[in-house]
Amino acid sequence: MSRLYAIILIALVFNVIMTIMPDMKVEAVSCEDCPEHCATKDQRAKCDNDRCVCEPK
């Protein structure tokens, strides 16, 4: 019975981690697509080392 609880706990922790992780990922958007990409988030586009960075307005 304790193995069942352990499996359920691991599944719940994994679910929480997978929910949080996409928010922390770095999006690989080229500088050409940066203005459109940041406009969808209502943020200002900035290109840094050939990488798109969205900053708050």
Swiss-Prot record:
Domain notes: Has the structural arrangement of an alpha-helix connected to a beta-sheet by disulfide bonds (CSalpha/beta).
Residues of the signal peptide: 1-19
Subcellular location: Secreted
Lineage of origin: Eukaryota, Metazoa, Ecdysozoa, Arthropoda, Chelicerata
Function: Inhibits Kv1.1/KCNA1, Kv1.3/KCNA3 and Shaker potassium channels.
Disulfide cysteine pairs (residue numbers): C31-C47, C34-C52, C38-C54
Chain residues in the propeptide: 20-28
NADP among keywords: no
Cellular component per GO, a single term: extracellular region
Tissue-by-tissue expression: Expressed by the venom gland.
GO molecular function annotation: ion channel inhibitor activity; potassium channel regulator activity; toxin activity
Claim: Signal is one of the keywords in the record: yes
Origin: domain of life: Eukaryota
Family: Belongs to the short scorpion toxin superfamily. Potassium channel inhibitor family. Alpha-KTx 08 subfamily.
Protein's recorded name: Potassium channel toxin MeuTXKalpha2
Keywords for the protein's UniProt record, in alphabetical order: Disulfide bond, Ion channel impairing toxin, Neurotoxin, Potassium channel impairing toxin, Secreted, Signal, Toxin, Voltage-gated potassium channel impairing toxin
